[in-house]
């Protein structure tokens, strides 16, 4: 028992010695790490905070001293911000134009791919044929002078073109007044003689005088309505080659609205009709009766009244240019009426010995693009139809054109309800 107590006492003594040693060791470490003591370290932190506070106060004084400079900078920044906003707006507008141009280019590329590659037909009711042919690549070398003029006058690569000589000044003057009244900007007169140039200048209307061409000049300077009308198929070709869509207009037309807001632009040719009702304007099944054939006496035929060659819209496509070439060539070899040839080329199908024109076509709404037969035979006698305001009125069915043009202005522009009443349906 005595030996056991001695071992316990020795163990306690060694523990005390170890504790003393550890305490001394910790004290040495603290003296090295904190030579100024714990409380002096806290004082140092306080001093640092005071230095920081003094520094902040100094900065505050400096900022107060430069407040005027800050105000000037803010004013400059405000001015720059306004200018920057204007520039951003211009960039957005230009970006949108580029996007639209790229979209048109992409659509044309897709059309070429569709036309040049094999495709599979979709499910029933989903297949649609290609109606809108791709436009040609513009070629400014064809007529650099005209290209510069169209770049200034055309809107969205579209232009109204009117061929005129001095024989039609009274009607043209009335048409120009209607164009200005509506606010149409992209309107161009092709002056066929010197007198017409002077007339256009006096009316402040944009005009274009072609380079000398004997074949055109001879007719243009002295020809009547029909002769001049036939020239357009030669003249319009350059417009299409330059990449512009053309809305051809005769002079016996009154503009009451901007026609470009009423076009579909999905076909090569978009034309007003000479028809006077739904059947004649848009087509109908005409049954031919031949009693001698007995059981087969009835033969079905498709009929439509002609497209009017005095007001039509052409997209700059190969079929459109082909149409102009065909009509111009036929007219150069015969005394045919240009409107008859225009429709023959549009509607005759390919058959043995003849290759037809593969152009897509659309008939304009006959109440928007109204001929004078529709107006005087139907519309003026119908109280509901009289409330409609057409886009144009074409006095193509009547020889007393100028008088009726004035009456159209009186009725649709000035509101004179009886302005159309004194005229007969047809001509005397």
UniProtKB/Swiss-Prot annotation:
Plays a role in the arabinosylation of cell wall components. Involved in the arabinosylation of extensin proteins in root hair cells. Extensins are structural glycoproteins present in cell walls and its arabinosylation is important for root hair cell development. Disulfide bonds: none annotated. It is a single-pass type II membrane protein. Expressed in roots, rosette and cauline leaves, stems, flowers and siliques. Disruption phenotype: Reduced arabinose content in the insoluble cell wall fraction of meristematic region. Reduced root hair length and content of arabinosylated extensins in root cell walls. The conserved DXD motif is involved in enzyme activity. It comes from Arabidopsis thaliana. GO terms for cellular component: Golgi membrane. This is Arabinosyltransferase RRA2. It comes from the Eukaryota. It is found in: Golgi apparatus membrane.
